Amino acid sequence: MCSSDLRVSFGGRSKEFTDKDRRLSKFLIKHKHFSPFRHQHVMMIIKAPEFVMRQWYKHVVGIETTSDHPTKDHAWNEISGRYVEYSDFYIPENFRAQSSDNKQASEGLVEDQENAEKLWSDAQQKSIESYEKMIEMGMAKEQARSILPLTVYTQVWWTASFQSIMNFIELRDEATAQIEIQEYARVLKKIMLNVFPETTKLWQEVYWDAQEK
């Protein structure tokens, strides 16, 4: 991040990230003074199944809400099924069993993997074939898409602040999050360590490493 973002209150400006800036950043992160971390933004193109995106777009921490444009530092644009035809679908490697003590979690695998895969594949194939036939007969894409499963891949252009992305990683790269979105959070972490290495490492020291202990 730009060290000047840390010192707005003092009117200071700098182009270098010094040890002093590093200590200040860690102090601000530790004591939850997050506003300086909303000035840095990343724009990403994300391809993910619809059921993952439904969880993703709920993340709003780190978004400016005090202006007349409440999402001015956060943008979300998705490919529309009204204009394009869907043709790519997520296929899981295995089928997990429902957790015995957590209504929203999974644990282990379904014992009959072969039958689970057949049931899943048959249902997917039926909806996809019906969608394609509806398109062929001239039905409007905006209507035909309504029968597609949540495994359909969509693409999103996502612009978010540094804080917003850190919050996403903290909540989704975590044992109780759904496995599929955990995988995206881990990729995001690698991206942020490359784009903002110093500040991301500090965030990791304060929050992620402590979370794993």
What would you call each of these model-derived segments?
Residues 1-213:
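Family-specific signature for flavin-dependent thymidylate synthase
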